[in-house]
Amino acid sequence: NNFYSYNAFITAAKSFPGFGTTGDTAVRGPIQISYNYNYGPCGR
């Protein structure tokens, strides 16, 4: 659906070195899954 490309995501993530790498599960907390309510409209 071309919301953003894989390469654009990787480039943006590299701008934030702590993205997905900082803290442990106690600090980050549980994964938040809310079905597709937040992301579904992005692909339309």
From Swiss-Prot:
Keywords: Carbohydrate metabolism, Chitin degradation, Glycosidase, Hydrolase, Hydroxylation, Plant defense, Polysaccharide degradation. This is Endochitinase 1. Its EC number is 3.2.1.14. It catalyses: Random endo-hydrolysis of N-acetyl-beta-D-glucosaminide (1->4)-beta-linkages in chitin and chitodextrins. It holds the Pfam family Glyco_hydro_19. Defense against chitin-containing fungal pathogens. InterPro entries: Glyco_hydro_19_cat, Lysozyme-like_dom_sf. GO terms for biological process: cell wall macromolecule catabolic process; chitin catabolic process; defense response; polysaccharide catabolic process. GO terms for molecular function: endochitinase activity. It is an enzyme of class 3 (hydrolase). Belongs to the glycosyl hydrolase 19 family. Chitinase class I subfamily.
